[in-house]
Curated annotation (Swiss-Prot):
Residues 1-23 form the signal peptide. One of its GO terms (cellular component) is extracellular region. It comes from the Eukaryota. Belongs to the DEFL family. It is found in: Secreted. The keyword Disulfide bond applies. Keywords: Antimicrobial, Disulfide bond, Fungicide, Plant defense, Secreted, Signal. Its main location: secreted. Disulfide bonds join 27-71, 34-56, 40-65, 44-67. This is Defensin-like protein 173. PANTHER family: DEFENSIN-LIKE PROTEIN 171-RELATED, DEFENSIN-LIKE PROTEIN 183. GO terms for biological process: defense response to fungus; killing of cells of another organism.
Length: 78
């Protein structure tokens, strides 16, 4: 019969996986009100590059145009 693994095996594996993976959630920038910017996504790509995307957060008072884009980092990833 096989022996059950120690209760610490899975938490240790979990911690090792998260230590080796560097999370990159991206960056955000607010570029103005949605009533003044007709297409948030196109405006974000114009200002922040082709990998940017945008959406209108309807938080009241005309909404806010929010851009998400990859963060620029000085670190070299291997």
């Amino acid at each position: 019969m096989a022996k059950a693994p120690s209760p610490l095996v899975f938490p240790i594996i979990f911690l090792i996986i998260f230590a080796l993976v560097e999370p990159n959630m991206g960056c955000i920038q607010i570029i103005g009100r949605c009533i003044k910017i007709p297409d948030c996504s196109a405006s974000c790509r114009k200002f922040l590059g082709p990998h940017a995307s945008g959406y209108c957060d309807n938080d009241g008072a005309g909404g806010t145009c929010i851009c998400t884009y990859p963060c620029q980092t000085k670190e070299i990833h291997m």
